[in-house]
């Protein structure tokens, strides 16, 4: 079997989702860990293999208490191991979180060498900064040199969206969509007729979850009854502990709201895009 042929569909190889951008600071790890990891865990029913490739920042280390991923760090000096990690892990879904700038180019070059095995999906995150749209399109062009079916297998994540309302985020991400009444060039419609994308709403609960070492999705499904713990602490006169439990209860409630109003909507979009193989 010729493993270098990207058209070959390998039986037993699960989905590999590569989250990549040529620009740093666009929230790749937020999309990978807060959105894609819980989605795959929920659908597949097993821990997700999470490969982070970044010589400068290992954001996944913040998630010290997560129980939905098996984390693996890979430096750019070990990129020749990437294909083996993906190919040999036939029992899990795989997320590859690719660092920005030079790291992104090196990883894409490596994947181009070994082929995509026919099961790779690509997510390109971007913020609403002036250059983010152009950088996302530049990343898409690089992926198109590897991906045989880019129209189906590339999706954009509109990160730190202020609202999930389509009209609102279309204007917030004018750097990506453009606007009929405003001068704009090199926007996505110049290159793709029907691009796939989903907004990821910004919320302070995302920041809080990182400090707690977990994902928002896991926080929402934490079965701890913090209200009961607060009452018990108050009854024994431990007022500070009661306040602490009330604080965690608020975060838990905010996490549940985020799952219901943001993540579940994204999961529906991903359902139409990703075929989950059991």
Residue ranges and their predicted role:
Residues 3-39:
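Walker A (P-loop) phosphate-binding motif
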Residues 41-59:
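Short beta-strand-centered segment that lines the nucleotide-binding/catalytic pocket of NTP-utilizing
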Residues 56-71, 174:
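P-loop NTPase switch/communication element
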Residues 91-108:
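Switch II (G3) loop of P-loop NTPases
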Residues 112-116, 130-163:
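Conserved C-terminal guanine-recognition region of P-loop GTPase G domains, centered on the G4
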């Amino acid at each position: 079997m010729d493993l270098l042929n990207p058209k070959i569909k390998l039986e037993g190889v699960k989905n590999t989702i590569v989250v990549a951008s040529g620009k740093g600071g666009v929230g790749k790890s937020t999309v990978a860990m807060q959105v894609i990891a819980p989605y795959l865990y929920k659908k597949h029913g097993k821990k997700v293999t999470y490969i982070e490739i970044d010589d400068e920042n290992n954001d996944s280390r913040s998630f010290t208490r997560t129980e939905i991923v098996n984390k693996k760090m890979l430096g750019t000096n070990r990129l020749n191991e990437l294909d083996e990690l993906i190919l040999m892990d036939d029992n899990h879904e795989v997320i590859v979180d690719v660092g920005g700038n030079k790291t992104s180019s090196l990883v894409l070059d490596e994947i181009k060498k070994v082929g995509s095995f026919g099961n790779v999906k690509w997510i390109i995150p971007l913020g609403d900064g002036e250059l983010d749209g152009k950088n996302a399109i530049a990343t898409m062009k690089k992926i198109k040199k590897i991906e045989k079916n880019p129209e189906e297998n590339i999706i954009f994540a509109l990160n730190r969206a202020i609202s999930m309302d389509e009209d609102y985020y279309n204007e917030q991400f004018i750097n990506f969509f453009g606007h009929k009444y405003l001068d704009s060039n090199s926007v996505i419609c110049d290159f793709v007729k029907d691009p796939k994308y989903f907004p990821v709403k910004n919320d302070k609960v995302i920041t809080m979850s990182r400090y707690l070492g977990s994902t928002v999705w896991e926080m929402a499904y934490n079965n701890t009854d913090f209200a009961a713990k607060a009452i018990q602490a108050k009854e024994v006169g431990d007022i500070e502990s009661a306040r602490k439990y009330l604080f965690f209860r608020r975060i838990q409630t905010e996490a549940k709201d985020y799952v219901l109003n943001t993540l579940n909507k994204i999961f529906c979009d991903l359902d139409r895009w990703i075929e989950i193989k059991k």
